[in-house]
Amino acid sequence: MRTVFVGAQEKPNGVSSYTYNLAAELNRKGFKSSVLSFGSCNKESEYKGILIKQYKCPGGTMTSIPILYWKSLPYIIKHRRSIDIVSYQTTTFSIFPSLIVRMFGMKASTIIHSLAEDSPKHGRKMKCLLRAMMKFSLFFSKTIITVSQTKAREIFDRYGAKCHVVSCGVFLPDNRPLNSDVIERNGIRQNKYFLTIGRVDPIKNLEILIDAFKQHEHGDYQLVIGGDTDTEYGKSIVERASDCKNIIFVGMVSGDAKDMLLKNCTAYCLVSSSEGLPIALLEGMAYGKIPIVSRIPAIQEVLEKHNIGLWSDVKNVKQLSENMKSVETDYDSLKVQGELALKIIKENYTWSQIADQYVELGKEIYNT
C-alpha cells in the first residue's frame, strides 16, 4: 500500500506534524509514503526517510492549499502506477482534485482535523460560508478521516457525514542529549514554569491563560508561550502580558528547542475552546507532565476516563488560576498525574499504533 499525503506546510509543526510523522512511520513499517507540501519555494527534501516534494504556493494557508492540490496533480498522475492512495489533508478544496485522482485509478481520502467555522476569529458571514463549503465538500468526498471519536460524532451531527478515525500520535522521547540553549537564552527557570506551545490563534484562549497566571501569586514560577506572535491576535496577547516579567514568549520552536521546553516544564497547559485531537497535549503527556486543560470533548476523550487532568470550564479564568496555584503548592501529590499521562500515551497514542490504524483503514479503502 503506497500513500501520497498532499497538503502539509513547509515545516513539520502543528497539524502538519500529523502528516509528516504518520508518513514517516508508515514508511518505516514498509508501506511506501511521501508528502507533497506547500512552501516558499520549489524543492525536494527528506524527513525521517520519506520524500518531501514542496511546491511554491503564494499567500496564506487558505490560498496555498487549493493551489497545491492543482499544482501537484501532474506529478500524481505521472506516478499513478506507484501510488495506491492519495490522502488530501483538508476536505475543503479537494473535491475536484480527488475526483481526477479517482478517474486515473487511484483511491482518494480526505481528513478533517478541526472545523474552521468554529474559530472565533471568523465573523458570522464567514462562518456561514465555511459551513456551506464543508457541506458541499463532504457530499462529494468518498472516504473521510478525522482524528477523534469526538470529532467524528460532531461532523455526523452537524453534516450527516460518517468519518473513519485515525488518531493523532507522538513519538516517545528518547534520552539523547538536546542541543539547544532555549532555556538559558530566555531566562527560563527549569522545572518552574507552565508551558503551552502551538498555533497562536483566538481559539486557543491564550489571553485567558495569561490572565489566570497574572491573577494569582505565582512567586518565581513562569508562564512560557511558544508560537508565532506576528499576527494581530499574537501582538494583542504580547501586549496583554507586557506588565508581567514572568510571562515569556519564545516564538516558534521545533526540534531540540521544543523538546527542551517540554522536558523541563512543570505542567503543560491547553485551554482551547475547540480541538480535533490536540497533538500539543499528547506531546506534553509523552514527557510525563501534569495536564492543565479546558473541559472540551476532544480533551475529555483523551483524559477523562483515566481520571486525570486539572480541569477548568472554557474561558474560566478563576478555575484555571486555581489549577495553576495547585500545581505550585501541591506538586508532589499531583506529579502522579504526569506519570499516568505518559502511561496513556504508551498504551494508545504512539505513532506506531496510529500507523497500524491507518494500515487497516488503507486496506479497506484500497479494496472498495
Feature annotation, model-predicted:
Residues 273:
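Aromatic "clamp/platform" in nucleotide-sugar-dependent glycosyltransferases that forms part
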Residues 305-317, 326-331:
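Conserved acidic donor-binding segment of nucleotide-sugar-dependent glycosyltransferases
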Residues 88-94, 112:
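Short His-centered aromatic/hydrophobic patch
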Residues 290-293:
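Short hydrophobic beta-strand element within catalytic cores of glycosyltransferases
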Residues 4, 187-204, 210-214, 224:
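Conserved donor-binding/catalytic core segment of Leloir-type glycosyltransferases
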